[in-house]
């Protein structure tokens, strides 16, 4: 959009808004998802000041806060001087990542609950057999922290072993 001032002899100057003669530099990308834009287009979008484009970037960041677009935005924000949008996008990334990490801890907690249930062991016995304290297991189950990958493997193996023993006991006629 361009702004033009028209001056007339008898009247005060008037301001006329005219459509820009050139299409937006982002026009080539408008129909593509933001996730498929090159970094140069992300940079242009951040610098352009177009709210609708920023909204699309925010949606992409929330959808995948560690994905390609997030990395591109981080790269652009290192060099761009758009403080307002830069601060906002940084905040979106930070919050989206925190929410994702909380969701992942909750998912791990659900998996641990299922492993304990499947094993037939009490929580205390399960914790003892995987080599953690009851408090540590409680922290895993509350999604406060996540166990290491090695601990998850140990939990799955323990659950498998006790589930197999439980199945064999119920399969035997007494």
Label each PLM-derived region with a short phrase.
Residues 91, 95, 147-169:
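DNA major-groove recognition helix of helix-turn-helix/homeodomain DNA-binding modules
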Residues 34-38, 49-53, 104-108, 118, ...:
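Alpha-helix N-cap/N′ positions at the starts of helices
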Residues 122-128, 137:
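Short alpha-helical "recognition helix" segments of helix-turn-helix
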Residues 56-98:
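Interaction interfaces in information-processing and related assembly proteins
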Residues 1-71:
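DNA-contacting interfaces and partner/effector-binding or oligomerization modules
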Residues 131-147:
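Recognition helix of helix-turn-helix/homeodomain-like DNA-binding domains
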Residues 90-118:
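A short, Lys/Arg-rich alpha-helix, primarily the initiator
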């Amino acid at each position: 959009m361009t702004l033009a001032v028209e001056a007339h002899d008898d009247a005060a100057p008037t301001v006329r808004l005219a459509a820009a003669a050139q299409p937006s530099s982002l026009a080539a990308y408008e129909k593509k998802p933001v996730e498929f834009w090159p970094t140069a287009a992300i940079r242009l979008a951040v610098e352009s000041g177009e709210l609708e484009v920023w909204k699309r970037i925010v949606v992409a960041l929330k959808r995948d806060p560690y994905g390609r677009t997030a990395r591109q935005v981080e790269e652009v924000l290192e060099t761009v001087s758009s403080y307002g949008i830069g601060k906002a996008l940084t905040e979106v990334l930070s919050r989206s990542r925190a929410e994702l990490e909380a969701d992942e801890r909750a998912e791990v907690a659900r998996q641990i609950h299922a492993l304990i249930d499947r094993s037939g062991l009490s929580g205390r016995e399960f914790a003892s057999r995987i080599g953690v304290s009851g408090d540590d297991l409680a922290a895993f189950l509350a999604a406060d922290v996540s166990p290491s990958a090695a601990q998850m493997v140990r939990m799955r193996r323990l659950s498998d072993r006790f589930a197999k023993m439980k199945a064999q006991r119920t399969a035997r006629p007494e």
